[in-house]
């Protein structure tokens, strides 16, 4: 038994090391790649200081943190809702953050500071997550909870579309395009949003014990002495915060929170002590690679990263849905 446990521990460490190396390589590639390839030796030249340190580095850090946040949010929601298909984008949480953001632009007439817009996005994500948690407490089946989340997402999307058509604000129309997901406008002015993600990410990665209990189911978690009400509300707040900040940074990006936790579980990372940091590393790597594809796929324009993640993630989601039905 001890031998098996040690083998599993070594395997987990190997996986985390491999994911760390992958993330580091993706980060370096993201800083080098672009319309102009800038090698490591040119990073401290005048050209490198402009392209690498002023343009690419803030974008790369934002992509890294948002990818980690979305993947961890997916893992937390799957444990929280006891549902393998739970994910911020599919369950409408990202669209809820978008509604909060657009409401702030409309009501504030474009005069609100960036921090207020970020807080409104977080509030929108929290409201949708709380509604979903109420549905989950009624012990809906996987398909019903998924449909409820999709319905909430459609309602939020419709509200955003109505706001766009009845608004004369150019900022709001640009915001709708940005809500499709993209890091094109990220620079050092958004560094406060990046910093807002770091403490919550680190805190959740340290909460493996309650997460493991929640993954066992509500009855087992109660029997093990876990205060369910407290942990549900804290994790809902943390997830809403991460999704809201991510939407404020880059718009709605789907499928990262669904696909990454599933792939890692298929690789044997089921213990949340390893799954949570693994999700952070894998989510950051996957979104960095998707961002590189979005930047380089077209010569004269930049693809929206939400299009890239949806193209890659939708087939995996269909496969997972068919697998869940079996």
UniProtKB/Swiss-Prot annotation:
InterPro entries: ABC_BtuC-like (IPR037294), ABC_transptr_BtuC (IPR023691), ABC_transptr_permease_BtuC (IPR000522)
GO molecular function, one term: vitamin transmembrane transporter activity
Keyword entries, A-Z: Cell inner membrane, Cell membrane, Membrane, Transmembrane, Transmembrane helix, Transport
Subunit structure: The complex is composed of two ATP-binding proteins (BtuD), two transmembrane proteins (BtuC) and a solute-binding protein (BtuF).
Task of the protein: Part of the ABC transporter complex BtuCDF involved in vitamin B12 import. Involved in the translocation of the substrate across the membrane.
Homology family: Belongs to the binding-protein-dependent transport system permease family. FecCD subfamily.
Protein name (record): Vitamin B12 import system permease protein BtuC
Lineage: Bacteria, Pseudomonadati, Pseudomonadota, Gammaproteobacteria, Enterobacterales
